[in-house]
């Protein structure tokens, strides 16, 4: 009894399974039939041999996304898109990063050719030319009437050398201006320009400039020696003064005592003075001793224009 029940149940299960299998087989056949239908086309012309076209639906089942994908697959591959992409990649790569640090310096270049050797003689000659140009430029401000055209005479346009005509007595405790000069006729003496007055012993500046002056006086103090012992305040001063105002303007001065054992001694004074145009200079002797002094006729007075 129990055996017959188990047999009937098994037979019923087999029938049910067979029916399900037949339904699955039928569905598979329908699917393959749809694949083999004329709606499926092969796109050999588009370069995809053997590819199948998905089934088309006539209803709302066909979506825009599906058609877009089909158009993308079927598009001609001409390589322009890849070129555009490569161009964009290069451009983006060129602008993406910051510039790097500068590279290391390169190796030094070859040494240059040796320079021209400069001798001390060449340097000295060049220095002399520079000095000459500077001197000519310094004197370029003088009036043309005072500058001769000859280059050898341009540096000294006013100069003089003169001597006393005769001895000059200087009384005790007095200040005397020396006058009465003469231009020596011996070789070596000179008188250039028109600024010197020999009779007055005065030189008048033709232009505002710097001048050099010198006076060399031979003093005879034999009378003072005969009086015995000299005092400490017995001395003589020689001055070159501007406008006869020795204490108001700058003056050149030399002081000498009278303790010399010789009968005649020499007092010299020299230096530079700046004179305005029209000012004059002259030589003065200040005798502070208690006896008369004699300035011998060999005493001299000289001067020259240096520059503006």
Curated annotation (Swiss-Prot):
Residues 82-93 have a biased composition (Basic residues). Residues 36-119 are annotated as: Disordered. Transmembrane segments: none annotated. Induction: During adipogenesis. Upon insulin treatment. Up-regulated in obeses mice. Transcription is activated by KLF3 and KLF15. Disulfide bonds: none annotated. It comes from the Eukaryota. Residues 99-113 have a biased composition (Pro residues). One of its GO terms (molecular function) is hormone activity. Residues 1-21 form the signal peptide. GO terms for biological process: D-glucose import; establishment of localization in cell; gluconeogenesis; negative regulation of gluconeogenesis; negative regulation of inflammatory response; phosphatidylinositol 3-kinase/protein kinase B signal transduction; positive regulation of D-glucose import; positive regulation of insulin receptor signaling pathway. Glycans are attached at residue 39. Residues 153-308 form the C1q domain. Changing residue 39 to A: Decreased N-glycosylation. Processed into Adipolin fC1QTNF12 and Adipolin gC1QTNF12 by FURIN. Insulin enhances endogenous C1QTNF12 cleavage. GO terms for cellular component: extracellular region; extracellular space. Widely expressed, with high expression in subcutaneous and epididymal white adipose tissues and brown adipose tissue. Expressed in adipocytes (at protein level). Keywords: Disulfide bond, Glycoprotein, Hormone, Secreted, Signal. InterPro entries: Adipolin/Erythroferrone-rel, C1q_dom, Tumour_necrosis_fac-like_dom. The record marks 287, 297 as: Not glycosylated. The record marks 91-92 as: Cleavage. Belongs to the adipolin/erythroferrone family. Insulin-sensitizing adipocyte-secreted protein (adipokine) that regulates glucose metabolism in liver and adipose tissue. Promotes glucose uptake in adipocytes and suppresses de novo glucose production in hepatocytes via the PI3K-Akt signaling pathway. Administration lead to reduction of blood glucose. Able to attenuate inflammation in fat tissue. Homomultimer; disulfide-linked. Adipolin fC1QTNF12: homotrimer; disulfide-linked. Adipolin gC1QTNF12: homodimer; disulfide-linked. May interact with ERFE. This is Adipolin. It comes from Mus musculus. The gene is C1qtnf12.
